[in-house]
C-alpha cells in the first residue's frame, strides 16, 4: 500500500475510533481474543466434533430434533458443566415443562439456576435480552422456539390466522440479541422442534419452526436424533443418540458424535471414554477384556464402564489424554475456519421475507 493510502486509512480508522470507541475496528492480527472460550457439552465425542472442546461463548447455538431425542437433556448437561466452572445460568422455560428433579440428577445445581416461565414469546425474548445486557449471566437456554407464542396469537381466538407472526418476532429479537450476546460473551442456546413441509416431493421435507432468521444468526446448529434403544435384559434403560453438527462457524462443520443417554443419569461419560479410548489405543481390547496401562479393568463393556465410574481418577486421566490427542489438531481460532463461512448475510428486509416464507 502506498503512503497516501496508508495516511488515508489511518485517518479513517482514527475517525471511526473517535466516533464509535476504541476497538470498534481493528486488524484481525492485532487482537489477542482470537481464541474462542467454550463450555463442554457433557459429551466428550460431541466436544471433539465441535472442534473447540464445547459450545462457543458469545454466540447463538440452535439445537433441534424430533420429540424425545435428548434436546433438553443435552442443554441441562451444558448447564451442569457451566455451573462446575462457576458460571451463572438461566433457563427460560417457554414450554413450562422443566423437571427440577431430573435436572438435579444430571448434576444441575437447581438452587442456583435462574428459571423463568414467560406468558408470551415477546416476554421470553425481552427477559433473555435483559439477562444478556446485564453481563452477569453466562449461559441462557430458551426452551423452545416453537413455544414462543406471540402475544397477538394468545389474545386472539383459537381459529384466527396469524401468518408469519412468530417468524417476524424471532427476526426482530435476534437482530437485537446477536450484538449484545457477543459483547457480554454469553452463550445463548435455542432449542427448536422439527416440522414437516407439506407437498415436498424431493429433498428433505423437515424444517424447524420460527422461520429462517435463527438459521442465519446461529454460529452452531446441532441436529440431535435417537438412533436406538439401550436395553438391560428386556428393560429399556436409555437411548443411543447421534448429534450432527450441521453448521459451525468456529470450526469445520458436518462432523457427528454418537453417545448414550441413560434414563435418570444423562449422557454416559464412561461409555464414550471406552469407545474413544479403544479407537485411540489408550485402552487395549482383547476379546471381551478391556485393559488400561496393562491392567485389566473389566470383561465386557458394562464391567469396564463400572470400573471407570468407581475409579474417577483413571477416568479423568483418560479424558485428559483424549482431549489432548483429539483437540490439538483443531486449534480454537476463527482464522482457521474462513472457508466455512460462505453464506451471504441478508438485509433486514430479505431476512424478514425469508422468515415469513418458512413460517408454519
From Swiss-Prot:
It is found in: Cytoplasm. ATP binds at residues 65-72. GO terms for cellular component: cytosol. InterPro entries: AAA+_ATPase (IPR003593), DNA_recomb/repair_RecA (IPR013765), DNA_recomb/repair_RecA_CS (IPR020584), P-loop_NTPase (IPR027417), RecA-like_C (IPR049261), RecA-like_N (IPR049428), RecA_ATP-bd (IPR020588), RecA_C_sf (IPR023400). The keyword Magnesium does not apply. PROSITE patterns: RECA_1, RECA_2, RECA_3. One of its GO terms (biological process) is DNA repair. Keywords: ATP-binding, Cytoplasm, DNA damage, DNA recombination, DNA repair, DNA-binding, Nucleotide-binding, SOS response. SUPFAM superfamilies: P-loop containing nucleoside triphosphate hydrolases, RecA protein, C-terminal domain. Transmembrane segments: none annotated. Can catalyze the hydrolysis of ATP in the presence of single-stranded DNA, the ATP-dependent uptake of single-stranded DNA by duplex DNA, and the ATP-dependent hybridization of homologous single-stranded DNAs. It interacts with LexA causing its activation and leading to its autocatalytic cleavage. NCBIfam families: tigrfam_recA. This is Protein RecA. It comes from Tolumonas auensis (strain DSM 9187 / NBRC 110442 / TA 4). The gene is recA.
Amino acid at each position: 500500500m502506498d503512503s497516501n493510502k496508508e495516511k488515508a486509512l489511518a485517518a479513517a480508522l482514527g475517525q471511526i475510533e473517535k466516533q464509535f470507541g476504541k476497538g470498534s475496528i481493528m486488524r484481525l492480527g492485532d487482537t489477542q481474543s482470537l481464541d474462542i472460550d467454550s463450555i463442554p457439552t457433557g459429551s466428550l465425542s460431541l466436544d471433539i466434533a465441535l472442534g473447540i472442546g464445547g459450545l462457543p461463548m458469545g454466540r447463538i447455538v440452535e439445537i433441534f430434533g424430533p420429540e424425545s431425542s435428548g434436546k433438553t437433556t443435552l442443554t441441562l448437561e451444558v448447564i451442569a458443566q457451566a455451573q462446575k466452572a462457576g458460571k451463572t445460568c438461566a433457563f427460560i422455560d417457554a414450554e413450562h415443562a422443566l423437571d427440577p428433579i431430573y435436572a438435579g440428577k444430571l448434576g444441575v445445581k437447581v438452587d442456583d439456576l435462574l428459571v423463568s416461565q414467560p406468558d408470551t414469546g415477546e416476554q421470553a425474548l425481552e427477559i433473555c435480552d435483559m439477562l444478556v445486557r446485564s453481563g452477569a449471566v453466562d449461559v441462557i437456554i430458551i426452551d423452545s422456539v416453537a413455544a414462543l407464542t406471540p402475544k397477538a396469537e394468545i389474545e386472539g381466538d383459537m381459529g384466527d390466522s396469524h401468518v408469519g407472526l412468530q417468524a417476524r418476532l424471532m427476526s426482530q429479537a435476534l437482530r437485537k440479541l446477536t450484538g449484545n450476546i457477543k459483547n457480554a460473551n454469553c452463550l445463548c442456546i435455542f432449542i427448536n422442534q422439527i416440522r414437516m413441509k407439506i407437498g415436498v416431493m424431493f429433498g428433505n421435507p423437515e424444517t424447524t419452526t420460527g422461520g429462517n432468521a435463527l438459521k442465519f444468526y446461529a454460529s452452531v446448529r446441532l441436529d440431535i436424533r435417537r438412533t436406538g434403544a439401550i436395553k438391560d435384559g428386556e428393560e429399556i434403560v436409555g437411548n443411543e443418540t447421534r448429534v450432527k453438527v450441521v453448521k459451525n462457524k468456529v470450526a469445520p462443520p458436518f462432523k457427528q458424535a454418537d453417545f448414550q443417554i441413560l434414563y435418570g443419569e444423562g449422557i454416559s461419560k464412561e461409555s464414550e471414554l471406552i469407545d474413544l479410548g479403544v479407537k485411540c489405543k489408550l485402552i487395549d481390547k482383547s476379546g471381551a477384556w478391556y485393559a488400561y496401562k496393562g491392567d485389566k479393568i473389566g470383561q465386557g463393556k458394562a464391567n469396564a464402564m463400572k470400573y471407570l465410574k468407581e475409579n474417577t481418577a483413571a477416568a479423568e486421566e483418560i479424558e485428559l489424554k483424549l482431549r489432548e490427542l483429539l483437540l490439538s489438531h483443531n486449534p480454537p481460532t476463527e482464522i482457521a475456519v474462513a472457508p466455512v463461512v460462505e453464506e451471504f448475510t441478508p438485509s433486514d428486509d430479505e431476512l424478514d421475507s425469508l422468515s415469513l416464507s418458512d413460517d408454519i
